A protein has these predicted regions:
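Single conserved hydrophobic/aromatic residue that forms the stacking wall/gate
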Residues: 1-13
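Flexible, glycine- and charge-enriched loops at secondary-structure boundaries
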Residues: 2, 77-80, 84, 116, ...
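Short, conserved active-site loop motifs that form the nucleotide-linked donor/cofactor pocket
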Residues: 9, 58, 136
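Active-site-adjacent pocket scaffolds in enzyme catalytic domains
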Residues: 14-101
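C-terminal domain-boundary segment and adjacent tail
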Residues: 38, 88-157
Length: 157
């Protein structure tokens, strides 16, 4: 297990863990393992929040399968236009809501799916669209977690 984590650290920005087969013990186990500062074993909110794990605050960055390119494989998306329109509509809704309450949009991308030529154009088009809006931050989840911990640590429960 530790060798696997070391190799993953060499190749990735951050450690990963299962989000799909999580058990009631997963959050405690990743908090104990060390090297993690958050988890995404949650689909219940638009913003990060803190929970208690063994009497310590733990950051949860909620995730969304709605805007994940895996929908090409599992059904729900047929064309790259479908993916772009869904991402754009989701962004537009959250951006409007974000005028009064902050929002976070997760977009799950996989090299083997959105790395394909036609699908990569949808991602490029979406990023171009989003970049035209003020007050939008496109960031990897680790940067969001670090920002949240720095700016909202006083809200830990």
């Amino acid at each position: 297990l530790h060798l696997s984590f070391r190799r993953q650290r060499q190749m990735c920005i951050r450690d990963r863990f299962t989000r799909y087969g999580a058990s009631v013990n997963t959050r405690e186990l990743i908090a104990e393992e060390g090297g993690f500062i958050d988890d995404s074993i949650s689909f219940n909110d638009d913003l990060p929040y803190f929970v208690n794990v063994k009497d310590k605050p733990w950051l949860v960055l909620p995730y969304s399968m709605e805007t994940n390119d895996a929908r090409f494989w599992r059904g729900g998306l047929v064309s790259t236009g479908d993916f772009y329109e869904y991402l754009k509509d989701t962004f537009d809704c959250l951006y409007e809501e974000g005028k009064t309450h902050p929002k976070m949009m997760s977009v799950g991308l996989h090299c083997r799916i959105s790395g394909r030529p036609a699908r990569s154009l949808a991602v490029e088009k979406f990023l171009g669209y989003v970049n035209n809006f003020p007050n939008v931050w496109i960031a990897p989840r680790i940067d969001i977690a670090n920002w949240w911990l720095t700016n909202y640590s006083g809200l830990k429960q």
